[in-house]
């Protein structure tokens, strides 16, 4: 990390403050998962969310500057495997949609109708996101507002990832 001029701060709860909720900016899907996270069928239940990572980088003047990266993974609830992901320097629809497209291709072998579950972030309320799911006959599911337990599989993954990183 030092060779790349990165310096990471210690992990704190305060550093996990990214919130993608911007009110109702699109369609709110019903909560089809209802905390039934277990499945015996691979690629049937997929969960996603966006998280923010902060890191320090030394600029050309030798000063440390805070930078951010945004991760948009799609995780299979069958075995906890990350099927696809997008990384960007700003929260972007392009990152979410490209990761969504990869996840749809990977899960196309599922013999049953798939469900993609997320929180109510702006990216998952977009018409483009919803219409791609509809075109591929995939159910869209969203957590209740302000309820992290409805997407606890993804939140737990982020918690472990950040503890390992920082």
Regions found by a protein language model. Give the residues of each.
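Basic, flexible linker segments flanking DNA-binding modules
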Residues: 1-41, 147
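RNase H-like two-metal-ion nuclease catalytic core shared by retroviral integrases
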Residues: 19-20, 24, 118-120, 126-127, ...
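Cysteine/selenocysteine-centered motifs that mediate thiol-based redox chemistry or coordinate metal-sulfur cofactors
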Residues: 108-127, 131
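Active-site beta-loop-alpha junctions of metal-dependent nucleic acid enzymes
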Residues: 67-68, 85-109
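Cytochrome P450 core scaffold surrounding the K-helix E-X-X-R motif
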Residues: 55-57, 94, 126
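Short small-residue beta-strand/loop micro-motif enriched in glycine and branched aliphatics
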Residues: 79-85, 140-143, 166
């Amino acid at each position: 990390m030092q060779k790349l001029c990165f310096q990471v701060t210690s992990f704190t709860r305060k550093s996990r403050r990214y919130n993608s909720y911007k009110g109702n900016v699109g369609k709110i899907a019903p909560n089809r998962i209802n905390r039934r996270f277990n499945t015996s069928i691979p690629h049937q239940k997929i969960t996603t969310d966006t998280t923010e990572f902060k890191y320090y980088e030394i600029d050309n003047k030798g000063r440390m500057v805070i930078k951010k990266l945004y991760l948009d993974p799609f995780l299979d609830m069958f075995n906890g495997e990350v099927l696809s992901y997008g990384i960007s320097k700003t929260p972007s629809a392009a990152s979410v949609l490209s990761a969504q497209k990869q996840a749809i291709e990977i899960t196309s072998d599922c013999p049953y109708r798939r469900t993609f579950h997320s929180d109510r972030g702006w990216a998952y309320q977009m018409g483009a996101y919803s219409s791609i799911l509809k075109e591929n006959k995939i159910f869209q599911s969203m957590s209740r507002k302000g309820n992290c337990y409805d997407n606890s599989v993804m939140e737990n993954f982020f918690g472990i990832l950040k503890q390992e990183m920082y």
